[in-house]
Amino acid sequence: MTAETKRVGATGGMENSFGFTQIDEAQKQSMVDGVFHSVAENYDRMNDILSLGLHRIWKNSMITWLAPPAISGWKVIDVAGGTGDIAFRILNASRKKAHATVLDINHSMLNVGKKRAQINGLAPFIDFVEANAEQLPFSDQSFDAYTIAFGIRNVPHIDKALSEAFRVLKPGGRFLCLEFSNVEMPLLDKLYDLWSFHAIPKLGQLIAGNSDAYRYLVESIRMFPKQDDFACMINRAGFSRVSYRNFTGAIAALHSGWKI
């Protein structure tokens, strides 16, 4: 079952997945919020655990593929990017010529990002916005690029988030999504499962005092659509020239699309 599978629950409402657990659709966002409130201060460390530290290399590849220009007025929105990690990389790559909007539904994550922006001298180049990826508070054709890293699998309605991404991009705009994916190497998948389901929750308890949050994050990765299926979803949202690159045996994949 993919993250977009829906069933009718016992209360009559539609169901969605929270990791491996089926819940009423209306519950998912608040439950996901709870997870990220609890891990906000340790979010980058969490990604180190989930990716064995490789997320930093993957993010650098994401920025290289985006190739943000050193042009004043070039605007990017980074969705589910509360801690600012992707936005900071984009601003540095553009020599602080670009302007970034960091959008996240979770104020704890945004607070971490705001503090880091001040520390790194990047606050003048970033707006932090608390809002929902499914209902972006921006006009049509507002941005030159849309990025999202390790966030879209936590959105209750992925199709709505993709439609909103298409709407707010200018013609010629770029969509890039970095996400944990479906491991394709026979031995690596077994080793990664062992790491994910046995080691990660224990490390989550040790580092953040919250094994359940880390268990959800692992399960949410397994529930996310496979690379080809997600590419089809991007295409259905209206994007052209849709493609993806696998990283590290497909532990993660970087998806790209253009608004033509």
UniProtKB/Swiss-Prot annotation:
Pfam assignment, any one: Ubie_methyltran
Metabolic or biological pathway, per its Swiss-Prot or TrEMBL entry: Quinol/quinone metabolism; menaquinone biosynthesis; menaquinol from 1,4-dihydroxy-2-naphthoate: step 2/2; Cofactor biosynthesis; ubiquinone biosynthesis
Matching InterPro entries: SAM-dependent_MTases_sf, UbiE/COQ5_MeTrFase, UbiE/COQ5_MeTrFase_CS
EC number of the protein: 2.1.1.163, 2.1.1.201
UniProt GO BP: aerobic respiration; menaquinone biosynthetic process; methylation
PROSITE patterns to which the protein is assigned, alphabetical: SAM_MT_UBIE, UBIE_1, UBIE_2
GO MF, one example: demethylmenaquinone methyltransferase activity
Annotated keywords: Menaquinone biosynthesis, Methyltransferase, S-adenosyl-L-methionine, Transferase, Ubiquinone biosynthesis
Keyword Transport: no
Protein residues bound to S-adenosyl-L-methionine: T83, D104, N132, A133
PANTHER family, A to Z: 2-METHOXY-6-POLYPRENYL-1,4-BENZOQUINOL METHYLASE, MITOCHONDRIAL, METHYLTRANSFERASE
Function: Methyltransferase required for the conversion of demethylmenaquinol (DMKH2) to menaquinol (MKH2) and the conversion of 2-polyprenyl-6-methoxy-1,4-benzoquinol (DDMQH2) to 2-polyprenyl-3-methyl-6-methoxy-1,4-benzoquinol (DMQH2).
Name this protein carries in UniProt: Ubiquinone/menaquinone biosynthesis C-methyltransferase UbiE
